[in-house]
Each structure stands twice: as C-alpha cells, then as structure tokens.
C-alpha cells in the first residue's frame, strides 16, 4: 500500500461517490485509533419529524483496531422503537503524519430488528492538517440485501473542514452527498476533559438541504464518553 495508490483511488472514486445513491446524514469519522481506549457513544439525527438514534459501546483491541456495537432506534411520529443492530470496525492504516494524508478504513454490518434485512458498508477515511485547519473525507460503499430489500450497491461522501480554535470548541462545516442527499451546514464540537484520561466529546450541527430530495434542515447531535 502506497500513498500514491490510495490518493489515486480516492480522487477517481470521489465524483462517482457524490453522484450515486446516498447514505443518511450521520457523522464524519476520523482515521485514528487510540490504544486501550473505551467509549460509550450516543448520537441522533432528526429531520422532518423523524428521529434516528444510536447507542453504542466500543473498545480498542490494538493501537490500530477499534470495534463498536450499536443499538439503533427510531422515533417516527408518536412511535419509538428498536430498528436494528450494528457492528462497526475501524482500522487505522497509517501513522499520523506518516504521509501527506492520514488513512483509515471503516467496516459496518447492520441487521434490521426482527427482519432478515442486512446492510454491509465500508468507508475510506482520509484526514489532512494545514496549521489549525483540518480536512476530513469519508468515501462510502454500501451493499443491501435480504427480506423485502432490493439487492443494490450505494455510495456516498461525507466531508468536513474544521478549525482547531481550542480543545473545548472547534467550529466546522460539513457536506453530505449522494443521489438522495445534498446537505451542507455548520457544526460545532469540542472536548471536556476529566481526570485520568477521561473526556466527553460532543458535536452538534444543522445541515441545510441543497436538493428537493433532502430535508430542508437536519439536526445532528453526538455525545461520546471516552475512558
């Protein structure tokens, strides 16, 4: 694996990713793993009266490999119910600063609750720093199959530009692209540190729809306790 090869692949597939079917607006992943880290994560995406929530717990198995399991629940109108389960694996492919761009990979397997519907997704994670600015890109490839699900391959992209103002507050702008998703908007995030390496990471943002198929406004929230 070389930097030139990965960069060429990323530049070739980016236009295809943005033009193809899209994943739901969620979050932007970073390509790093901290050895011995454990976390409990909650996040929510809300649009047009619907709320999708995830509750997960994860741990680093090595200094390059992190795994996390999630419960997925949705509130649609007056109904709140369990929607599915997800297993996520994140792999750090290069050391931070080893190349001009830092590289990682993410693999997710999701199963619908009480249904035989499955979803397998993988993403190439890229991050680059320019002084206080940090640029991050996630390029997704997803395959769905199972009961009452049309077998199909979908792609999407999530992009983030973040300014490292202070550890407690970092403003950013995010873009999510796919055939059914075009959204852009401001995001804020930060870390609240406690003793003995524990911290609370938070994110909040509003993504504005840029196409008729995308909700006018999507709210995303995230809280992640790392220990």
Regions flagged by a language model, labelled:
Residues 20-227:
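Transmembrane beta-barrel domains of Gram-negative outer membranes and organellar outer membranes
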Residues 1-25:
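Cleavable N-terminal export/targeting peptides
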């Amino acid at each position: 694996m070389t930097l030139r090869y990965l960069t060429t692949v990323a530049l070739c597939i980016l236009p295809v990713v943005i033009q193809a079917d899209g994943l739901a607006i969620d979050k932007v992943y970073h390509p790093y793993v901290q050895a011995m880290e454990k976390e409990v994560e909650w996040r929510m995406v809300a649009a047009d009266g619907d709320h999708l929530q995830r509750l997960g717990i994860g741990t680093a198995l090595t200094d390059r490999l992190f795994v996390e399991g999630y419960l997925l629940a949705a509130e649609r109108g007056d109904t709140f119910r369990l929607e599915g389960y997800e297993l996520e694996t994140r792999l750090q492919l290069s050391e931070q600063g080893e190349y001009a761009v830092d590289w990682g990979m993410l693999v997710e397997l999701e199963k619908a609750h009480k249904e035989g519907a499955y979803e397998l997704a993988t993403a190439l994670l890229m991050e680059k720093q320019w002084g206080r600015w940090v640029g991050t890109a996630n390029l997704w490839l997803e395959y769905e199959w199972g009961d009452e699900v049309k077998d199909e391959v979908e792609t999407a992209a999530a992009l983030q530009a973040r300014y490292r103002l202070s550890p407690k507050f970092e403003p950013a702008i995010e873009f999510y692209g796919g055939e059914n998703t075009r959204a852009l908007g401001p995001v804020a995030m930060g870390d609240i540190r406690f003793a003995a390496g524990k911290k609370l990471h938070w994110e909040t943002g509003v993504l504005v729809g840029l196409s008729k198929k995308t909700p006018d406004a999507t709210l995303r929230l995230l809280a992640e306790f790392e220990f």
